[in-house]
């Protein structure tokens, strides 16, 4: 899977360069993240760029995977992630609950993805196969790839957050500004639709 080589943020003359090959990936058990962001969020709110870089390293892969799965373009995914991180870096001082960092930055990402998707629909020119290379997604199952492609953009976003990154229905609801019961119901319908399509019934 293609990844962004780096994301560079400029803010009041400070520069953060976070390279993808040195990322410290956050692991989770049962969909519950085990990292406590509190200390670094407090430092980042005070202008500590190194603390923000550490926060970035813990969420980058989640951000990129969700953006790529939703937008189906590595270039656009990198752009959306870069915009998300820039916004987060410049507004982290407004984040009151340190433990809410992950959900907060995912909300920013969700808004950026939706904006990019609106740009797609506004553009009447169709994208070529070269602009959407299937190998970026690493789908071994062609039928699954095609079934996911037929989902609407919001369904792909919800599915990616659940299946790829392990977010719970409540977490997805909070990030996307939806009702938790609606998210769980929609996830169930999405999975059932994929199951039926793949089984040929």
Language-model-detected regions and their locations in the chain:
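Sigma70-family region 2
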Residues: 45-46, 82-100, 119-120
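DNA-recognition helix of helix-turn-helix
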Residues: 110-111, 164, 170, 175-201
């Amino acid at each position: 899977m293609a990844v962004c080589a780096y994301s560079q943020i400029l803010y009041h003359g400070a520069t953060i360069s976070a390279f993808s090959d040195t990322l410290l990936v956050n692991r989770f058990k049962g969909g519950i993240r085990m990292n406590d962001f509190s200390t670094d969020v407090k430092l980042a709110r005070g202008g500590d760029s190194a603390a923000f870089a550490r926060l970035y390293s813990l969420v980058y892969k989640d951000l990129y995977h969700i953006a790529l799965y939703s937008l189906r373009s590595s270039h656009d995914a990198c752009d959306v992630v870069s915009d998300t991180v820039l916004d987060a870096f410049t507004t982290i001082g407004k984040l009151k609950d340190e433990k809410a960092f992950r959900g907060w930055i995912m909300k920013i990402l969700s808004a950026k993805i939706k904006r990019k998707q609106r740009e797609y629909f506004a553009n009447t020119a169709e994208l070529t196969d070269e602009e959407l290379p299937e190998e970026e997604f690493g789908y071994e199952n062609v039928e699954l790839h095609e079934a996911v492609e037929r989902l609407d953009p919001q369904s792909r976003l919800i599915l990616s957050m659940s299946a790829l990154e392990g977010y719970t229905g409540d977490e997805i609801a909070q990030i996307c500004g939806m009702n938790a019961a609606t998210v769980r119901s929609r996830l169930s319908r999405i999975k059932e639709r994929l199951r039926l399509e793949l089984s040929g019934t």
